[in-house]
């Protein structure tokens, strides 16, 4: 979400003339992230986020925006894309597709506790179930085919144990993806990037008995149809880890997984392959961060993430230490 593409005041005025969202009060770039150009937009009608898509094409974009509209209609708290005067959910700005969505209430919780993980686990399961009847389809663009394509471009920059791990884990995941158990895993639309900075929390009402309230999930632009367990693994690998070591925190992990399965119970196949999917979730982000680190794009406010973080997480998932895991009635 770094600002790769700047927007001038006259350009913004012309863009906003195609919306019925009132007059612009404030407009500023968002510096976090590395994929799209994002801006906070406040008008006399409300608060929004303007996104210019740096990689996604106009052909790909309807999947993401229509999914967000579908989830919002099913009472899942997500940003709702705003239609233009012609009814379209996106247009063209600087020759790139761009859209405006509603801004969620609250702020990210960068040091989540058990209660935050419970809220996220329940809502993630609700989101998965709400997406079952979504008719759009887009594969997870950062899954195995992308790993196969990208890893050879990264390997020349690595040596020794790093190089060996990147290659050996790809082979492990190829075998896992080809298995009958993998094929049997439940699937559907997934967020696929549900890190702690992609959710908002607000203060809960005093009469609820809770300290926090989930404001919603956002940044769906890595979403795709994939195994739901992959989405859970990606989420756990961020929300439930010690950031310094990559080790899973038992209390947060158990809280998130138990909360998730109160809404959607895990299957026996999911239970068997929880460890494999935790590795897949870590590998996906190690590969993408290595790629962004060694093959960066020029950007106005680029802040690349440390690839070593997910290398540590992947190595932790390989240690053989008993992991906090999922539970099914088959145990």
Swiss-Prot record:
It is an enzyme of class 2 (transferase). Pathway: Amino-acid biosynthesis; L-threonine biosynthesis; L-threonine from L-aspartate: step 4/5. This is Homoserine kinase. GO terms for biological process: threonine biosynthetic process. InterPro entries: Aminoglycoside_PTrfase, Homoserine_kinase_II, Kinase-like_dom_sf, Pseudomonas-type_ThrB. Gene3D superfamilies: 3.90.1200.10, Phosphorylase Kinase, domain 1 (3.30.200.20). The lineage of its organism: Bacteria, Pseudomonadati, Pseudomonadota, Betaproteobacteria, Burkholderiales. It catalyses: L-homoserine + ATP = O-phospho-L-homoserine + ADP + H(+). GO terms for molecular function: ATP binding; homoserine kinase activity. Transmembrane segments: none annotated. Belongs to the pseudomonas-type ThrB family. It comes from the Bacteria. Its EC number is 2.7.1.39. Keywords: Amino-acid biosynthesis, ATP-binding, Kinase, Nucleotide-binding, Threonine biosynthesis, Transferase. Pfam families: APH (PF01636). CDD domains: HomoserineK_II.
């Amino acid at each position: 979400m770094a600002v790769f593409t700047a927007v001038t005041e006259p350009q913004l005025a012309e863009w906003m003339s195609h919306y019925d969202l009132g007059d612009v009060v404030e407009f500023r770039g968002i510096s976090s992230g590395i994929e799209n150009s994002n801006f906070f937009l406040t008008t006399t009608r409300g608060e929004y986020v303007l996104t210019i898509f740096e990689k996604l094409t106009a052909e790909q974009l309807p999947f993401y925006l229509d999914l967000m509209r579908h989830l919002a209609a099913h009472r899942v708290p997500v940003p709702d894309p705003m239609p233009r005067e012609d009814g379209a959910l996106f247009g063209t700005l600087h020759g790139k597709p761009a859209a405006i969505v509603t801004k969620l209430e609250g702020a990210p919780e960068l040091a989540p506790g058990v209660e935050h993980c419970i809220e996220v686990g329940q809502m993630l399961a609700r989101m998965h179930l709400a997406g079952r009847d979504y008719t759009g389809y887009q594969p997870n663009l950062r899954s195995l085919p992308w790993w196969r394509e990208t890893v050879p471009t990264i390997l020349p920059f690595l040596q020794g144990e790093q190089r060996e791990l990147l290659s050996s884990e790809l082979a492990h995941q190829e075998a896992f993806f080809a298995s009958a158990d993998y094929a049997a895993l439940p699937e559907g639309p997934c967020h696929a990037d549900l890190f702690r900075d992609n959710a908002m929390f607000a203060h809960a009402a005093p009469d609820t008995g809770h300290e926090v309230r989930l404001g919603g999930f956002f940044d769906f632009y890595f979403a795709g149809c994939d195994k739901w367990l992959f989405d859970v693994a990606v989420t756990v690998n961020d929300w439930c880890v010690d950031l310094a070591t990559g080790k899973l925190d038992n209390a947060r992990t158990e809280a998130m997984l138990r909360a998730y399965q109160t809404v959607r119970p895990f299957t026996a196949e999911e239970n068997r392959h929880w460890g494999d999917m935790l590795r897949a979730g870590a590998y996906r982000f190690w590969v993408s961060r290595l790629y962004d680190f060694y093959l960066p794009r020029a950007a106005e406010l680029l802040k690349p993430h440390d690839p070593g973080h997910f290398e540590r997480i992947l190595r932790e998932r390989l240690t053989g230490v008993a992991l906090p895991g999922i539970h099914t009635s088959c145990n």
